[in-house]
Amino acid sequence: MEHAQAPALVICGHGMVAQRLLEQLVATGHPFSRIVVFNGEPFAAYNRIQLSSLLANQVRESELELKPRSWFRQHKIEVYNREPVTAIEPQQRRVTTASGRTLAYHTLVLATGASPSRLGLPGEDLDGVMTFRDLTDTRTLIHRAQTHRRAVVIGGGFLGLEAAEGLRARGMDVTILHRSGHLLNRQLNPAAGELLKHQLQQRGLTVLTGTEPTALLGKDQVQAVQLSDGTVLATDLVVLATGIHPNKALAEAAGLACNRGVQVDSQMTTSNPHIHALGECCQFQEHTFGLVEPGYEQAAVLARHLCQVSGNPGFTPGEIATRLKISDLPIFSCGPITPGPHTETIEWQDYAQAVYGQLLVEHNRLTGAILLGDTSSAPWYSELIRSGTDISRYRDTIAFGKPYCDAAA
């Protein structure tokens, strides 16, 4: 067993949020004499957001690196790749890794992320059935796109759309299957979803909504997808993009309180005062988190807490804005997408220019926004939603954006 110099910090996982925590700790001036990161992936932290750009051949793999090795040496941070923590002993305050290494800790942080959800379909174990989650997945998809022609992406959320567009850019014929009646149904209303579908089809993607697979067919290699209406789609590759679930098994085995994720308080502390969690593996109140922005906010909160910064307000989940670009079509969504009984809707659309907007207003406050095509006003709308600003003076011009409203005021 390795005896850590007290106090020692051990971090389980090295994704973007864990890396942000390390940077915040360094910037704040942490009290730890030793920081050790155990990472299940073969690579140190990289920009996971750019995986879709890598798949689409828009960036090089080297551009995904967040920090060079010299940064970790400079700040005396030890990173062990391909070595996930496999057991936590809270009473003894030590962890065991996949290699059999045992290490004592003063403070432990769980940043174990999330895993792709499976549908439990017959044939999911066939060769050619994949997920799109990490750099290893992306490398495999790039390789297969060089030797295969047809792909089916199951799931019309943002990850599925990014996978589909990346494979299309690599020259594959791609079909998107989505169970809901419109794409991005958690971020867009039906009108925006229909416009998005039309634009993707214009770019060469096949989009089937309101349908779902019942089986993946083939002997050893996947050869087709059977749909609920009996249709059979021939394919060489299937990408499952049907959501994620928090990686909580390690915490559960250690006796930590878990629900959908590892439960934490506003300081990102679990049911054990010496163990913290953040990012996709954690749950705060009823919220779990699939985007990097709240994870970065959690990293800032936890860094202040671990560095004992006074006046740390704690983590408060707000309205999370979704920003992405599919086939060069920018998309923004923040807040609710469906009007309530006391909601006023402001809506505009230019189908020919692939532009759509919806604003939801309640009691002179902007509560929700959807933008497709022209997202130049997204930062302003996002700030209005988060601040709860009275928009009475902008009511008749808010759809034209901040510069117009300021000039007209």
Give the positions of each predicted feature:
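FAD-binding core/adjacent interface of flavoenzyme oxidoreductases
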Residues: M1-V10, K67-V152, Q226-D229, V239-A241, ...
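Mid-to-C-terminal Rossmann-like scaffold of FAD/NAD(P)H-dependent oxidoreductases
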Residues: E2-A8, A27, C281-P379
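Residue-level detector of alpha-helix initiation sites
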Residues: M16, P42, A114-P116, T136, ...
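Rossmann-like NAD(P)H-binding beta-loop-alpha module
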Residues: T140-L188, V222
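Cysteine/selenocysteine-centered motifs that mediate thiol-based redox chemistry or coordinate metal-sulfur cofactors
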Residues: L141, E319, I391-A409
